Amino acid sequence: MLFKISLKNIRKSLKDYTVYFFTLILGVAIFYVFNAIDSQSVMLDVRANMMDIIKLMNDMLSGVSVFVSCILGFLIIYASRFLIKRRNKEFGIYLTLGMSKRKISVILFFETLLIGIVSLVAGLVIGTILSQFMSVIVANMFDADMTKFKFIFSMKACVKTLIYFAIMYVLVMIFNTFSISRCKLIDLLNAGKKTEKVTMKNSIICTIVFVIGVGILSYAYWMVTRGVRTLNTFDKIGIPIALGCVATFLIFWSVSGFMIRIFTSIKSVYYKGVNSFVLRQFCSKINTTVFSTTVICIMLFITISVLSAALSMKDSLSKDLDSMCPVDVQLAKYSYDAMSEAYATSQDMSEKDREMLEDSKLSIIETLNNSGFDAQKYFKDVAEYNIYNTGLTVKDTLGDINTDDYKFMADTIMPVMTIGDYNSVARLYGNSTYELNDDEYIIVADYKNMVMVRNQALKKGITLSVNGKEYKPRYNECKDGFVQIGVLNMNDGILVVPDNAVKPQQVRNMGLSADYRADTKEERYSIETQLDNLMKNISYQTSFISWNSRIDLAESSVGLGALVTFIALYLGIIFLISSAAILALRELSDSADNKERYGMLRKLGVDERMIDMALFKQIGIFFAFPLILALIHSVFGIKFINIILATMGMSSMAASIGLTLAFVAVIYGGYFLITYLCSRSIIRPVR
């Protein structure tokens, strides 16, 4: 009997449950999709190093899922609160007819169970379909062989989804039971006659608070842009964040009175059509949702900023790979003179240390050949070079230029190369080569922030003393270039001098850049594997040698890009649907409560088109308000993130911002449209 009542109630209130159903199904689908990546990655044919990166990504996503489940759990309980409130009169009738509160709780239990089962089944079906597309995206990201691709259903992700959402629904059932047990019959029966207590705030006080909020927010914006130099520790970064949250709350608390004061003074706008009705409705609503609107605004801000940053990082890590990694492999090794100096103060050298010191007398190719790796057989287009330590520091090359931002590297030894060595590397990389007179030097750099500082010094014609001889700059600016392969422009400066400017005993590092003698990807992987196995045995075991490769850098950049993108997408979608769902549920509840007010408009002669437009404006303003402030926050948040990314040599976020805004518009706009259509259905008279 109670089960039949529950089933009938769900059918009858289907339009009230539309947003709730939509959110639950979407939440289940997203939860399954991101947790199914673990099972789908098993079928990817990738190297062991790449599989380790994928495993790390899956572990991170699993941890994020715990946080996501808390967000969704809060959302479901919040939604249940509104749905129960909508049905207070119905529950009052049940009690009047003699039904006990325990039986009402059982009805709610069955309703929650049915909704849970339907949403889980529908969400898992949609999630399974979407996960197949996710498999293709993951495979493309990691450049995996798709020959083993097949339709896959992740039982592990399914069980995890069922467990997590089962816990959420149990909490909802407990909450519903608790809510019903506290209800009084008189309150339930009079629920439709009661309106939420709304206190219209003093407009003068609101204006003052609004100005204070804007002032605090302006200072927070200044801190993350012009005053960014003061934010040199993590705890200091929290200051503008805290100020922004407080200012956001103050703005939402005061905006109703502020808007009333502004618009009532503009008679032509206030009394046009039903604008006065729309404004009063919005202001009364914002007065009772200050905290939740603040939270929604902050979640939208986090979504826009984090997703833009993640997509920008992914693009920056992958787009310059070919130009920044023009060779297949690069090896480096400490020289004998450098290591002899390091061991000079050591009183007791082990046998292993003596062997490594002896090996430092050999070239990189000799070390490889002695270890069983035939460099001539596996390498081609080889460029060998030396990095020298002449005692010059970064501060010496900058002279009296203000280096407050780079104090930490002022005493760093300036790497020096001869023009002959640099040109041999540049020719191999396809970069520009240069010529020098006997008394000239060049600074080669590509890290933009440091290039700007160095250019100031070069324009002043700062002379440098190397081994007792003075050298002047050949150019009044840095020349673009690099020696160390990587994925970002992080060369903060190499001093290039004539071949006779340095001494052999000043060699600090030996370097080698080369391509593999291979024609296919398989052959490259084969050589890479042999070299990798060798390096595991000799790198800092029998030799002061290290290495890097294009394949390894590509895998690392792709892995990091995928990691930040998936986590940002996961959190972004959840934050978006949570924010939009809370607004939608609140609006639907208010539409039901205000049905009589819209009926009054009809009695006053307002036609349906104007009523629909009034509803559209009201819902539009309610949805737009937190979004507009979040977008303003994001402008300054993204500027701050741009500064951080620039210090890592990453590019602008312009392209990723557009993609993020489109993503927000689709999900947030979709909820707005559903809310408007459902609200319009609620307020229209029954025919």
Where does each model-flagged region fall?
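Selective transmembrane-helix segments that form parts of the transport pathway or gating/packing helices
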Residues: 14-20, 108-126, 162, 166, ...
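N-terminal Sec/SRP start-transfer signal
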Residues: 1-28, 196-212, 253-300, 593
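Nucleotide-cofactor and metal-assisted catalytic machinery
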Residues: 321-562
